[in-house]
C-alpha cells in the first residue's frame, strides 16, 4: 500500500528529488561554507582604497565587506543599463558611449555626468 502511494505522481519525494538535491538547490548561509568567497572584489584591494583616503584612519572588516558589496551592486547596475543602450544600437559589446548614454538616461547616475570626459 505504501509503495502504491509513493509511486503516485505529485508526492513530495518525487518533486523534491533526493535529499541531497533539495539541500543543494537551497541557498546556503554565508557562514555555513568555510572559505566561500562572499565578495567578487578582493577585500584587501578595497581596504587599500579606503585607507588611501587621508581622512580614514581605521576601517573594520564588516565596513570593508559592505563597501565591496555596494561597489559590486553599483557596477552590476550600471553595466546592465549600459548593455541595454548597446542592445538598442544592435550591439552586444559595451562601448564608452553606452556608459555615457546610461549615465544620461538614468537619474541615479547623474552624479557621474562629465566624469568620463
From Swiss-Prot:
<feature type="modified residue" description="Phosphoserine">
    <location>
        <position position="25"/>
    </location>
</feature>
<dbReference type="Pfam" id="PF00808">
    <property type="entry name" value="CBFD_NFYB_HMF"/>
</dbReference>
<feature type="region of interest" description="Disordered">
    <location>
        <begin position="1"/>
        <end position="36"/>
    </location>
</feature>
<dbReference type="InterPro" id="IPR050568">
    <property type="entry name" value="Transcr_DNA_Rep_Reg"/>
</dbReference>
<dbReference type="GO" id="GO:0005654">
    <property type="term" value="C:nucleoplasm"/>
</dbReference>
<feature type="compositionally biased region" description="Low complexity">
    <location>
        <begin position="19"/>
        <end position="30"/>
    </location>
</feature>
<keyword id="KW-0539">Nucleus</keyword>
<feature type="modified residue" description="Phosphothreonine">
    <location>
        <position position="11"/>
    </location>
</feature>
<dbReference type="InterPro" id="IPR009072">
    <property type="entry name" value="Histone-fold"/>
</dbReference>
<dbReference type="GO" id="GO:0006261">
    <property type="term" value="P:DNA-templated DNA replication"/>
</dbReference>
<keyword id="KW-0238">DNA-binding</keyword>
<keyword id="KW-0007">Acetylation</keyword>
<comment type="subunit">
    <text>Component of the DNA polymerase epsilon complex consisting of four subunits: the catalytic subunit POLE and the accessory subunits POLE2, POLE3 and POLE4. Interaction with POLE3 is a prerequisite for further binding with POLE and POLE2.</text>
</comment>
<comment type="function">
    <text>Accessory component of the DNA polymerase epsilon complex. Participates in DNA repair and in chromosomal DNA replication.</text>
</comment>
<dbReference type="InterPro" id="IPR003958">
    <property type="entry name" value="CBFA_NFYB_domain"/>
</dbReference>
<protein>
    <recommendedName>
        <fullName>DNA polymerase epsilon subunit 4</fullName>
    </recommendedName>
</protein>
<dbReference type="GO" id="GO:0008622">
    <property type="term" value="C:epsilon DNA polymerase complex"/>
</dbReference>
<dbReference type="GO" id="GO:0140672">
    <property type="term" value="C:ATAC complex"/>
</dbReference>
<dbReference type="GO" id="GO:0003677">
    <property type="term" value="F:DNA binding"/>
</dbReference>
<keyword id="KW-0597">Phosphoprotein</keyword>
<dbReference type="GO" id="GO:0046982">
    <property type="term" value="F:protein heterodimerization activity"/>
</dbReference>
<dbReference type="GO" id="GO:0005634">
    <property type="term" value="C:nucleus"/>
</dbReference>
<feature type="modified residue" description="N-acetylalanine">
    <location>
        <position position="2"/>
    </location>
</feature>
<dbReference type="GO" id="GO:0003887">
    <property type="term" value="F:DNA-directed DNA polymerase activity"/>
</dbReference>
Amino acid at each position: 500500500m505504501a509503495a502504491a502511494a509513493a509511486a503516485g505522481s505529485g508526492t513530495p519525494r518525487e518533486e523534491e528529488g533526493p535529499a541531497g538535491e533539495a539541500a543543494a538547490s537551497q541557498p546556503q548561509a554565508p557562514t555555513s561554507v568555510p572559505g566561500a568567497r562572499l565578495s567578487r572584489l578582493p577585500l584587501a584591494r578595497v581596504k587599500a582604497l579606503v585607507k588611501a583616503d587621508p581622512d580614514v584612519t581605521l576601517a573594520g572588516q564588516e565596513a570593508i565587506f559592505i563597501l565591496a558589496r555596494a561597489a559590486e551592486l553599483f557596477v552590476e547596475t550600471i553595466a546592465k543599463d549600459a548593455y541595454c543602450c548597446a542592445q538598442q544600437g544592435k550591439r552586444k559589446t559595451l562601448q564608452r558611449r553606452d556608459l555615457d548614454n546610461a549615465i544620461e538616461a538614468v537619474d541615479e547616475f547623474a552624479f557621474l555626468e562629465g566624469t568620463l570626459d
